[in-house]
Amino acid sequence: AMEVAIRAVNLLYSYDIFSQLDEKKILDECFKKNFENYLWKHSIVIKNNLEYDFINGKSGNHYLADIVGLLWIFSYFRQNVSKKEYEECVIQFETCIVKQFLNTGCNYECSTAYHRLTAELVGIGLIILTPKERNSIIVNNKTRILGMIDFLDLCIGKDSHIIQIGDNDSGSVIKLFIRRSTQKRKEN
C-alpha cells in the first residue's frame, strides 16, 4: 500500500502543476473523470491494505505513508468522503507523528534514511491539511517537529548527503528537503 500511497501523492501533485499550466485545456473533463476514477481506486487499495501492526500496536514508515496518501486523496475528494473518515485520517496522521518520532524528534526506527523519509512524509502531510488542522498538529507536536528538523540537519554530511546509519531503502516521495551546497554549509 505504501507504493500506491506515494504514487497517489505524486499523481495529485503533478496534476495540480499541470492543471495550472494547461492553457490548451488538454486535461479536459474526460481526462479528469478517468484520473479521478484511477485515484479513487488508489484509496480503496490503500484502505484495504493498511500496513499497521495490529498485534503489537506499532506503526512504521509504511503506515505513515499509507495515511499521508489517504490524506491527499481525501483532501482532493473532500465532498465525497465522509467527515468521520476524513477526521479519523487526520487523527491517525497525528498519532503516526507521535508513534514514529521520539520526544526529541528522532525517528524510532533507528535509521537516518527512514528519519529523512518519515520527516518528508510529515511535511507532505502537513501541507495538504487545512490551516486549522495543520496549526493544531504543529502546536501539539512542536518539540517533535522541530527536533525532527534539527536531527535531519545533523544527519547531513559535508558533501550534502545524508550520513548512513541503519537501514536504507532510498525511499522518497517528493523531494522537499533540498541539499545545501557545501559552500553554504562551510559558511555556517
Locate each region found by the language model.
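Aromatic-lined, polymer-binding surfaces characteristic
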Residues: 1-146
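Extended polysaccharide-engagement surfaces of secreted carbohydrate-active enzymes
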Residues: 110-119, 123-188
